Amino acid sequence: MQSCLYECRVMHHRLVPKEHKFSYRIFVLALDLDELETCHKAFTFFSLNRWNLYSFNEADYVPTYEKIHNPSQNSSIKLTPALNSSLKERVISYLALNGIDCAGGKVTLVTVPRIFGYAFNPVSFYYCYNQT
């Protein structure tokens, strides 16, 4: 299994309008999107697409049939993959619409899971690899 858990530190420091800073520990999941079912079955307190202490809901990521802003092109596209497509398929479709071919490759998502059903995820990172 390639999916894993990372302990991290979130830090913030602003100077204006009033100085404010904080730092705290969090954990993030690095999920190989081909292993979602395996992860879900391997850990008692982790669930896929349903409530648990820790859960991962695919619908929280790369929404279908909604416009997704592409800042590099200053435009929005509407992602319309097949009904009931997996998160990995939606990521691959989004990349293909932007001229990037990752079909058959690996996609790892680094993100914060839902905790007690509550989703607070300020940023997620997708690491996408082509087939070679």
Model-derived regions: residue spans:
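Mature, function-bearing regions of proteins
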Residues: 1-132
